[in-house]
Amino acid sequence: MIAMDIREIGLRLVGEAIKAADPYRAVLNAVKVSDDKIIVQGKEFEIKGKVYVIALGKAACEMARAIEDILDVEDGVAVTKYGYGKELKRIKVIEAGHPIPDEKSILGAKEALSILNRARENDIVFILISGGGSALFELPEEGISLEDLKLTTDLLLKSGAKIHEINTVRKHISKVKGGKLAKMIKGTGIVLIISDVVGDNLEAIASGPTVKDPTTFEDAKRILELYDIWEKVPESVRLHIERGLRGEVEETLKEDLPNVHNFLIASNSISCEAIAREAQRLGFKAYIMTTTLEGEAKDAGLFIGSIVQEIAERGRPFEPPVVLVFGGETTVTIEGKGGKGGPNQEIALSATRKISDLEALIVAFDTDGTDGPTDAAGGIVDGTTYKKLREKGIDVEKVLKEHNSYEALKKVGGLLFTGPTGTNVNSIVIAIVTSKRGRT
């Protein structure tokens, strides 16, 4: 094992995770150009005509910049969140609304359709998708206004409908979701996707504009009725769904298209693998425990802490030195007035109760660099943190109950700061155990 401070090791592994999810780097790693061929993850595409780019999501500009740097781009559009825009050589940049779509979201989609209309059968169209694309890139179906679409989404959000149910309805009142964008590609579509969805379900990322969709107009109506909002949504939405049920409006994409190829180029899983590789290079055994971690943050922290305790005290299920990696997205349920913090800060703080006095470190962070509504990416704690908190008179149980993890961790140097990373592949927890208790 390389002689390094445990905190230094933790920070290095965080860096590897973020590097693996960097949009610019991810595109360059995935796409190679050789003579008159484009090679993506081993699949070859012949360059016979022009190259166009349509990028949508928070990482749109960085992904588009990478394509511009390796190919001669004829034209393109990048639709991203306000404040995320960067000037590109040939590609037009449009900043739009997120998480609520606005007129610029529609403008971005119209620009994209204009490009698809110009692209011929021998051309290549790159579609670059990242988190936030669902709101940033929108074009309601005929007869449905942006306000109607926003009201429908708002009613669904307030009804308690699950995210996949909300997306089912949205796909059936949008011209670009549920594989409908793919239907408009006449040439070769090369789709590069950065996943911000736990489990990497491509249908769920930006509401799946380029992948087949199993849901139907029947499902959309059933969901609106189930949550008792069928009569509350705008008449234009009801009429469109009724037309779909009668077969007068085309369904979402039901079969993969032979000319459209989807590639996952960055995800929580890919970042977790990068951590494991670097940990092994540093002399640790490394295990990816899950990439679908969900549930209440403080419970996840206690559970991860208890695994670390078992390893450090009994050498099971793994002997130290070892690195465990957990990917996913946990939540914080706030009742009453919450304090300052985020799910990853709660994971770290909660884990301190289990790893006190152990040769161990836990770092929990959001890969976008922002954990909850704070300037911290997450929390970083070790075997000394719990004692330091007690010495400062901080009651961990009370702080967790009040959801005030930021202030508690701040007092003991337990906050992790990365700054905005320009990417998002959800959250990651890294647990490092260097030796068993009583051993150095």
Swiss-Prot record:
Keyword ATP-binding: yes
Functional pH dependence: Optimum pH is 7.0 and half of the maximum activity remains at pH 6-10.
Keywords: ATP-binding, Kinase, Nucleotide-binding, Transferase
Binding site for substrate: 58
Protein EC: 2.7.1.165
Note on cofactor: Magnesium. It could be replaced to some extent by nickel, manganese or cobalt.
Pfam families xref list: DUF4147, MOFRL
Cofactor(s) required, per the database record: Mg(2+); Ni(2+); Mn(2+); Co(2+)
GO cellular component, one term: cytoplasm
Alphabetized GO MF terms: ATP binding; glycerate 2-kinase activity; glycerate kinase activity
Transcription found in the keyword field: no
Temperature profile: Optimum temperature is 45 degrees Celsius. It has strong activity at moderate temperature 30-50 degrees Celsius and about half of the maximal activity is retained at 100 degrees Celsius.
Catalyzed chemical reaction(s): (R)-glycerate + ATP = (2R)-2-phosphoglycerate + ADP + H(+)
Function: Catalyzes the ATP-dependent phosphorylation of D-glycerate to 2-phosphoglycerate. It can also utilize GTP, CTP, UTP, ADP or pyrophosphate as phosphate donor.
Quaternary data: Homodimer.
PANTHER family, per the entry: GLYCERATE KINASE
Homology family: Belongs to the glycerate kinase type-1 family.
Protein name: Glycerate 2-kinase
Organism: Pyrococcus horikoshii (strain ATCC 700860 / DSM 12428 / JCM 9974 / NBRC 100139 / OT-3)
Top-level taxonomy: Archaea, Methanobacteriati, Methanobacteriota, Thermococci, Thermococcales
